[in-house]
Amino acid sequence: MKASVRSTVTLLFFAILCSAFMLIAKPFSGEASPQQSPATSAEGAELYNQRCAICHDNPVDRVPPLFLIRRRSAEDVVQTLTDGSMKQQAKGLSADQIRALAIHLTGKQPGPPIEFNSETNRCTGAPPPINLNAPQWNGWGFDLDNSRFQPKPGIKAEDIPRLKVKWAWAHPGAMATGQPTIIGDRLYLTIEAGMVVCLNAQTGCTYWAMKPGAAVRAAVSVGKLPGGSKAKFALYFGDEKSTVHAVDAETGKQLWKTKVEDHFLSRITGAPLLYRNRLYVPVSSFEETAGRDNKYECCTFRGSLVALDAYTGKVIWKSFTVQDEPKPFKKNSAGTQMYGPAGGAIWSAPTLDLKRKLIYVGTGNSYTDIDSPHTDAIVAFDMVTGKIKWANQVTPKDNFLVGCRQPGVGNCPDNGGPDYDFGSSPVLRTLPNGKQILLGGQKSGVMWAFDPDNKGKVLWQAKIGSGGALGGIEWGFAADAENVYVPVADPLGSAARKPGITALKIANGEQLWHVPAPKAQCSWGTTRCINSQSAAATVIPGAVFSGTADGHLRAYSTKDGAILWDYDTAAPIKTVNAGITKGGTLDGGGPTVANGILYTNSGYGRLIGYPGNLLLAFTVDGK
């Protein structure tokens, strides 16, 4: 891409994506209200009008309104732009310009950059040895099937009404994203401000913290290294600059890092999947936010799956979801060259099928009018070679860019699509009779069942939500041996919206029960108070846990959907490391359960609801 074009698009993506990456909660605070008379500079106001106002004064699709950004602290904005996930987009801005913009946006003078002081709550005893046979939740979906089913949670369904907070921990200067990984008495957590921490899973005290150099948001995985390695166990994760990291799981020391995609708008949002000495990495992007700029040569990103040697970080193979390279196909109204095909981002963790030696992913939409057969699809890759063995596209020609409301304007596709990604991981389940079924949840609000023995042929489908850019099935569902439990987001739109949770039989798609999301009750007030049920669900024997955008985490009976327990995670609470803090919206990663403790982040309010910065641990009676 030409340097001049890259400079131009930097301005656009700064405007659109500042929403996604400046939503960083004030360090260890509950409610951060902007000053009534902000110390605004004229330069900051001018920068905002030039680069941000077009999106945040008229938010559509996934662009949040300005008032959410105003809740951030100035330090958060400065650090994100200088040393965090917005560093590339803010390229070319001076330190003084960044400071001026932060003052204008927040009404506060920036203080020191965000740092995490691990000594504040340092564990006094020696850390427990890592035991991969201990009770655990390792990675995104608990198992290689991505079932999100914990068969041995250490919590009985009948005891769930007695769950109470055992400890609470405040994310340092960031809203709570990601999902906790539990290995015995160790808890590993990614922090969007650009940190990874290791805590004691029983108490929340800190063993270590490290900074990989970019924002991180997905779950991590832990694996054993061969004898003679620099460490005994490695912790694996990807960051928002498309770099995969391996660090010593005992100390946090970097072992290796590998950049898996050179496109300057690429990122890793899904958790890499670890199996033996292979790490399978999904790659996604920011590029679909390019629609408003007619000077940007849109679009050239293609989603990919990358296999790495888990011991060394060496690339074994890389396979693109959109297999044809982008080529010039027309010029837009400004005379800017446009390219296609593009898109097919992989937003979530891959799923491994050892029987067939395949890896399954769900893909996102196309970005241009040049369609691809592997967008909005379930795609099966050969786990040895990376070759695509089959794909089933359920929504063709879903050509979508954020902010496109007028077809053909700027880079907007002439025939815009509905943005019906497969944003969550596929789930492979084996029925009691031995038959295997591959499940996929789509933002259209449709739950799909595919036949892995017949190149992904559709076995059944069930429409359980109205769907949309932020609707339908968003982050993930959970499945036990016979049933699948599916949260539906549907945050905004018509009266047909159906936020809630539905149980279906895996064998045939028959609906067992449906529970609408209760009326929203937000501890922060009525602003952005909605009952969208978009976060990933988690199931244990007898109960399924699912959160809503109003901050409520609930347990439902797997038998009939009866609500067994309801806790407001957004309410103020004393933390073990930073005084009183609030949570917020439950979105993104779901709860994890291991060794009798239920863990959840609270405060992923980037696109819906409200931000917060809590990690909560629940046990029976809080003991």
List PLM regions with ranges.
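Asp/Glu-centered strand-loop micro-motifs enriched in Gly/Pro and often flanked by an aromatic residue
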Residues: Q36, Q150-I183, L187-Y188, M210
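Detector for the c-type heme attachment site
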Residues: N49, A53-D61, T82, T106, ...
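Electrostatic cytochrome c docking/interface patches
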Residues: F28-L47, T124-A126
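Bacterial N-terminal signal peptides
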Residues: T10-K26
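Extracytoplasmic/lumenal domain signature
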Residues: A157-P172, V196-V216, V222-A231, Y236-S266, ...
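Blade/loop signatures of beta-propeller domains
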Residues: T120-K166, T321-P326
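Extracytoplasmic electron-transfer domains, predominantly the class I c-type cytochrome c fold
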Residues: Q36, I54, V63-P110, R278, ...
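Short, solvent-exposed loop/turn elements at domain surfaces
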Residues: R62-P64, L144-Q150, A174-G178, V197, ...
